[in-house]
């Protein structure tokens, strides 16, 4: 109760402080638009390039879609004044730029009359919401991009002390993908395991992924699980998917509605609160299109029957001070059957045999999705700006798979997911330096799944429904405090309230999961420019300090405070060194803290040993049955983490050549992480009894209980909230030789991972066109789990269904006139089924993709104008995924869905037309 009062006082104090800040005198002049900015923008359509400039610099550029229609911009990289950067982008387009109030830029026709450009530094560099009516001249159909910056509450300012990768709309659509999930999956920093549509039954070492009954897909940075990556839509949270609510289903977000995706490879609980342990994926929607755009795409595998159809329609209208945009997308994909991939081994059933009817077994489910996004913005007077976004998506999935205990053939599964969200944002300029922002939102996710008989004990189809919802409201004040030698101190102060609910109801059975949570928070952030280039300090061209902190109070887990500090040092022009340290806090997901899912099964030990080739630990265990438990333990604790990052960024432009180098090191210590108990050698849970019999110290006490008494057996069975299952020849809970609790979800002692991300990009304007080359690499140095402080550390890296140490993605591009081509090389290093001496090697996997596009500009035929056609071929050489042993309990076939794909060669053609 005392903590609640303290937090309320903090929130009231935050509100009072924001009002006082609005009344303070201006202590010094703003740095203005003469401060140099670092930009790295690929050659693209002029509108996309200007939006990329706004995203990277935090400075809005006001223009109409008609002004930039059919115009392109050359690539620019390096350090520029904002005005010089925009002038480089519009060079040769017949446009010119003038500076408006509020630190904005306004594009005009080169021959238009008007006031000359003001001298750089004469205007305030406040890149907040733009009052279009205060621009020097009134032009029709003007609008300003909303600058959403990931990893900060500061408006229009992107602290450079943390590693952030921005992927533009042109990069996303030009990568050959058809869905948001596909684009997230190809990022080197993302691990393909966890909750995805490729693993409907989950993965052995990720208990959360086993609750993904609706075939959703979540971002999984650093391989720490989808629940450790915070996924945002326009900077706001979404209601989570799965029966435990541990991830946002990115496959529900239409790719044609996206403006850009920003990936923060750093902890961010000091800004966003819980869940931002491994990083943040912020999907920012398009909100400023003027006109109409139609997109069609058809694709197919070259071996098999899978086909894919995508169609979208965008309609937008911009006017002075506002805009409205709607995007509809339809997506339909057939299933990929195991029969189409004869080199992939079918799964092994619990009776020891292989699934025999493989012509119906799906490696990838069929799905049909419809999505709609609406967004609007309106300026009301000089000070108030209102905006809103609404999102709805409906997906149906169907597949044939193997039930967990099926001993005969296959069963159909169907699932439906519905996701809806609406946000409202109001910005009010209290003064020239202070902006007050209020944001409110609601999001919900509903999913239902239907499966044919999965267990012999169940005589009817299994039906399951999950509903999750999220309400939130926040109030943030942004202001300038006073001026340091390097420039003005920027500050953000705010409070937030959030309510989360989740309920999981299997039809005809008791509720499995039921949880609700209220979260109140107060947070603050400071940007301190200690040294700027104007001071001419030797060896310190720029030095900045970023401080942020957040206090969250959870209705079910108390309060937590998480700080973060970041430092940026620019010793010379174009070279920036950065480092950050912060802490994070994540309460158990609602579906875990409110879980009623304890259950288990009885199997014959000789049967499971024969399938997995497990040696008999002791003659006393011959012929016994064993009881294995699963589900969620009681008395779960919150997860906490400490994250350290360090890196550099280097950009250099010399004539027609430009070079970018980036490197980042990360070190994450994840304590009390929820998961199943790791087994030495990263082996299956069924190997644990053999290890425990020889050396009990390998596991926490009570993990494996040998020769339990009848009272101990009865106590375990009495705690079950699900029906007991019998398999492998066992018919009763008698002759129990041991109880195996390895598969029970509980708090582990620690998970630690360290790694390096690197990027090198080169571009040249040659006689043949614009040449580009880029290589992205992710190298994991360590990835270890420890069940308790007294048990050995288990190394999970380079083992089956877990992260592989080295991932590469290389690109070679050529743009000449209206034609653009890109050749992509993907590589995943070799690894093994486990770290045990008897492990089976798994070869490396490399694929090559080709993406071609042609845009009709200044076409003689009017209907071809502003039309783009494209061809993409992924996995040109039709490389099969590396073969791996099948996995019994999870109905996994003979490939690793976490590190490869069964799709094979896939070709697609696309058509995009703007009106």
Residue ranges and their predicted role:
Residues 287, 303-443:
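Transmembrane beta-barrel wall of Gram-negative outer-membrane proteins
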Residues 288-291, 320-321, 380-383, 429-435, ...:
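Short loop/turn motifs that connect adjacent beta-strands in outer-membrane beta-barrel proteins
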Residues 669-671, 781-784, 826-832, 854-915:
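C-terminal beta-signal and adjacent terminal beta-strands/loops
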Residues 50-57, 110-173:
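Short, acidic, small-residue-rich periplasmic hinge/interaction motif at the N-terminus
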Residues 219, 236-265:
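Short acidic/polar hinge/loop motifs at secondary-structure boundaries
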Residues 29-37, 60-74, 142-181, 200-201, ...:
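N-terminal periplasmic "start-of-domain" segments of outer-membrane beta-barrel proteins
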Residues 105-108, 156, 185-236:
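Extracytoplasmic beta-strand/coil segments of soluble accessory domains associated
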Residues 105, 183, 187, 217-220, ...:
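N-terminal periplasmic accessory domains that precede
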């Amino acid at each position: 109760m005392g903590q609640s009062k303290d937090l309320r006082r903090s929130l009231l104090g935050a509100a009072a402080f924001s009002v006082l800040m609005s009344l303070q005198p201006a202590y010094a002049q703003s740095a203005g638009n003469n401060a140099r900015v670092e930009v790295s923008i690929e050659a693209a359509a002029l509108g996309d390039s200007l939006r990329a400039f706004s995203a990277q610099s935090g400075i809005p550029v006001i223009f109409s879609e008609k002004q930039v229609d059919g115009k392109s911009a050359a690539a620019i990289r390096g350090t520029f004044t904002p005005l010089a950067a925009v002038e480089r982008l519009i060079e040769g387009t017949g446009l010119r730029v003038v500076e408006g109030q509020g630190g904005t830029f306004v594009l005009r026709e080169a021959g238009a009359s008007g006031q000359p450009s003001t001298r750089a530094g004469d205007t305030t560099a406040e890149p907040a919401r733009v009052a279009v009516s205060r621009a020097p001249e009134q032009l029709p159909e003007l609008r300003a991009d909303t600058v959403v910056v990931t990893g900060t509450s500061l408006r229009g300012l992107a602290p450079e002390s943390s590693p952030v990768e921005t992927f533009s709309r042109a990069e996303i659509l030009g990568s050959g993908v058809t869905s948001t999930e596909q684009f997230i999956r190809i990022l080197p920093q993302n691990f393909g395991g966890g909750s995805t549509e490729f693993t409907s039954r989950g993965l052995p070492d990720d208990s959360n992924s086993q609750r993904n009954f609706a075939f959703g897909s979540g971002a999984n940075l650093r391989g720490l699980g989808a629940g450790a990556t915070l996924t945002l839509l326009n900077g706001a949270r979404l209601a989570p998917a799965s029966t435990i609510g541990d991830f946002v289903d990115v496959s529900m977000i239409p790719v044609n509605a996206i403006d850009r995706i920003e990936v923060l490879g750093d902890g961010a609980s000091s800004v966003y609160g819980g869940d931002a342990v491994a990083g943040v994926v912020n999907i920012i929607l398009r909100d400023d299109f003027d006109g109409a755009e139609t997109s069609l795409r058809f694709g197919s595998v070259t071996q098999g029957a899978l086909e894919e159809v995508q169609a979208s329609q965008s309609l937008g209208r911009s006017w002075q001070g506002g805009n409205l945009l709607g995007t509809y997308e339809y997506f339909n994909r057939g299933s990929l059957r195991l029969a189409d991939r004869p080199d992939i081994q079918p799964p092994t059933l619990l009776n020891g045999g292989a699934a025999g009817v493989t012509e119906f077994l799906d490696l990838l489910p069929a799905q049909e999705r419809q999505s709609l996004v609406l967004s609007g913005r309106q300026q009301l007077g000089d000070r108030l700006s209102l905006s809103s976004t609404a999102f709805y998506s409906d997906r149906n999935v169907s597949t044939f798979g193997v039930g967990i205990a099926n001993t005969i053939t296959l069963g159909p599964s169907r699932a439906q997911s519905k996701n809806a969200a609406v946000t409202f944002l109001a910005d009010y300029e209290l003064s020239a330096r202070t902006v007050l922002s209020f944001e409110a939102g609601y999001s919900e996710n509903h999913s239902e799944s239907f499966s044919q008989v999965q267990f012999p004990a169940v005589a009817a189809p299994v039906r399951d429904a999950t509903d999750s919802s999220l309400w939130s409201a926040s109030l943030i004040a942004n202001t300038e405090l006073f001026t340091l030698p390097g420039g003005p101190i920027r500050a953000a102060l705010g409070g937030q309230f959030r309510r989360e609910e989740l309920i999981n109801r299997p039809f005809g059975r008791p509720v499995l999961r039921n949880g609700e949570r209220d979260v109140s928070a107060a947070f603050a952030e400071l940007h301190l420019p200690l040294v700027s280039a104007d001071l001419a300090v030797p060896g310190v061209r720029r030095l900045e300090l970023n401080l942020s902190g957040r206090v969250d109070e959870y209705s079910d887990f108390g309060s937590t405070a998480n700080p973060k500090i970041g430092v940026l040092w620019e010793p010379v022009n174009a070279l920036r060194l950065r480092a950050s340290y912060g802490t994070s806090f994540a309460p158990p997901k609602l579906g875990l803290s409110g879980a009623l899912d304890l259950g288990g099964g009885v199997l014959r030990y000789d049967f499971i040993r024969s399938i997995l080739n497990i040696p008999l630990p002791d003659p006393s265990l011959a012929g016994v049955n064993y009881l294995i438990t699963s589900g969620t333990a009681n008395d779960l604790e919150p997860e906490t983490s400490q994250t350290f990052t360090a890196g550099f960024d280097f950009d250099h432009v010399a004539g027609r050549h430009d070079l970018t180098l980036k490197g980042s090191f990360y070190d994450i210590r994840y304590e009390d992480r929820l998961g199943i108990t790791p087994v030495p050698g990263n082996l299956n849970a069924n190997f644990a009894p053999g290890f425990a019999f020889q050396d009990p110290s390998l596991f926490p006490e009570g993990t494996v209980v040998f020769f339990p008494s009848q009272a101990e057996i009865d106590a375990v069975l009495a705690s079950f909230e699900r029906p007991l299952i019998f398999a492998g020849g066992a018919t009763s809970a008698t002759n129990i030789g041991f109880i195996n609790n390895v598969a029970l979800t509980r708090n582990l002692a620690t998970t630690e991972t360290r790694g390096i991300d690197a990027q090198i990009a080169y571009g040249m304007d040659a006689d043949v066109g614009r040449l580009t080359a880029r290589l992205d690499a992710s190298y994991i140095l360590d990835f270890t789990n420890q069940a308790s402080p007294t048990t050995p550390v288990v190394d999970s890296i380079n083992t089956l269904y877990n992260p592989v140490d080295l991932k590469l993605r290389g690109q070679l591009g050529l743009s000449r006139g209206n034609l653009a081509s890109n050749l992509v090389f993907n590589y995943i290093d070799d690894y093994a089924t486990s770290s045990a001496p008897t492990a089976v090697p798994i070869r490396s996997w490399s694929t090559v993709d080709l993406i071609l596009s042609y845009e009709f500009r200044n076409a003689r035929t009017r209907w071809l104008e502003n039309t783009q056609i494209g061809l993409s071929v992924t996995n040109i050489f039709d490389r099969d995924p590396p073969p791996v042993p099948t996995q019994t309990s999870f109905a996994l076939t003979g490939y690793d869905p976490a590190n490869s794909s069964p799709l094979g060669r896939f070709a697609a053609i696309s058509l995009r037309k703007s009106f």
